[in-house]
């Protein structure tokens, strides 16, 4: 971890740990990819342009703001088993469908300037990329949950949590 954090653009690497009784990855492969999660668009770069990170301890305040539009950037199955109560489920099968969903929403220019767009996903990757797309589309007040749902569930006491249901992960944790 120390070595990875010494690399350019990885200084603030957010490492996630979770315990498991059995091997979480039956067959682990490590591949170098150009993108971790593809949106299918070349001009979207969260390193150059992204929304504002919101730490888990500040997330509930953003959700309680009436000017906040909360968007779940995960696929339909993930949304169906758990989400934040007031979130919008885009009903997408995969992340590449997210831009098309946004374009169908017909947000007004006033909405783009005044509404707060808050997005979340499992670990923070899809919502960070989605925030870059939203900024690219002219939205000014774009936020995403730092570390994703997993970090929120790790840090926020269940009594204060606004999460309802389960959080799907792609392994056997």
Task: Give the location of each predicted region.
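Short amphipathic alpha-helices and their capping/turn segments at secondary-structure boundaries
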Residues: 59-65
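Rhodanese-like catalytic fold shared by cysteine-dependent sulfurtransferases
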Residues: 1-52, 65, 75-118, 125-173
């Amino acid at each position: 971890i120390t070595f990875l954090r010494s690399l350019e653009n990885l200084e603030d690497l957010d490492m996630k740990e979770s315990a498991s009784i059995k091997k979480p990855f039956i067959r682990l492969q490590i591949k170098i990819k150009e993108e971790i999660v593809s949106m299918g668009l070349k001009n979207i770069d969260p390193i150059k342009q992204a929304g504002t990170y919101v730490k888990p301890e500040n997330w509930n305040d953003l959700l309680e703001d009436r000017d906040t539009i909360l968007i779940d950037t995960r696929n339909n199955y993930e949304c169906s088993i758990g989400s934040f109560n007031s979130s919008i489920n885009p009903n997408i099968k995969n992340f590449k469908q997210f831009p098309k969903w946004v374009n169908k929403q017909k947000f007004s220019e006033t909405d783009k300037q005044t509404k707060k767009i808050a997005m979340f996903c499992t670990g923070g990757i899809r919502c960070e990329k989605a925030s870059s797309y939203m900024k690219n589309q002219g939205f000014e007040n774009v936020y995403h949950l730092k570390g994703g749902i997993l970090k929120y569930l790790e840090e926020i006491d269940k009594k204060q949590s606004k999460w309802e249901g389960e959080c799907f992960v792609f392994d056997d944790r």
